[in-house]
Regions:
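N-terminal active-site wall of soluble small-molecule enzyme domains
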Residues: 23, 27-87
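Alpha/beta enzyme core
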Residues: 16-28, 79, 101-113, 160-163
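Active-site mouth loops of central-metabolism enzymes
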Residues: 1-16, 92-95, 148-149
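Glycine-rich phosphate-binding active-site loops on the catalytic face of alpha/beta enzymes
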Residues: 74-85, 112-125, 158-192
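Alpha-helix-loop-beta-strand connector modules within alpha/beta enzyme cores
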Residues: 43-59, 86-98, 127-149, 155, ...
């Protein structure tokens, strides 16, 4: 299974250093998501990421920068729903309902489905997918290797995802909540990697 880390929505001091550290310790893919960012700040963060890792970075905002920096991919969402002209990389998309999953899954290289569990980073953003619903979606081939689980993913529940057929997991709050303690941050990342 693929482990994807998605950034916090806001910038913070030392963020690029932690991103590079994750890549140095085997991070397969990073989704850079800064919904309220201006282009200059967003691009500045990209420039602070070691260019050898650009082939593992997908961006949710300012998609034309994916072309400029030859990044791995872009992630479409309600704010940014079209790929930029000339972009030939990976295209993924956020999905939140069974109807969206059924209609749109095949249009993209991969999709995220959320929230699978109650969100760690968004208070009150609770899962709409019970274990029986997830089993049904797997049995109907709606969840497969192209569907990435998002929402409430922690080191405690990540190991349950393969039974539902997910191709990977995207983690946000459970990891970034530890950003103030580099050792605990890296230890938690390693726990996620080992359990996936």
């Amino acid at each position: 299974m693929l482990l994807i880390i998605i950034t916090e929505p806001g910038f913070f001091d030392g963020e690029a250093g932690l991103i590079n550290l994750l890549f140095e310790h085997g991070l397969q893919r990073l989704h850079l998501r800064k919904p309220d960012s201006n282009e200059a700040d967003f691009e500045s963060l990209i420039k602070q990421i070691n260019p050898q890792f650009y082939n593992r970075v997908a961006i949710h905002d300012h998609h034309h920068l994916a072309v400029r920096y030859n990044l791995f991919g872009i992630h479409l969402n309600r704010r940014n729903s079209l790929a930029p002209d000339g972009f030939c990389g990976s295209v993924s998309r956020s999905l939140h309902t069974i109807e969206e999953l059924s209609a749109d899954k095949q249009k993209y290289d991969y999709v995220t489905l959320s929230p699978i569990f109650d969100s760690v980073s968004k208070v009150g953003y609770n899962s709409q997918f019970t274990p029986s619903v997830l089993n049904d979606l797997r049995d109907r081939n709606l969840i497969d290797s192209h569907v990435i689980a998002l929402g409430g993913i922690t080191a405690y529940n990540i190991a349950t995802l393969p039974q539902y057929g997910f191709g990977g997991a995207m983690v946000l709050g459970a990891l970034w909540n530890l950003k103030g303690d580099r050792e605990m941050f890296l230890e938690y990342f390693e726990r996620l990697r080992k359990k996936i």
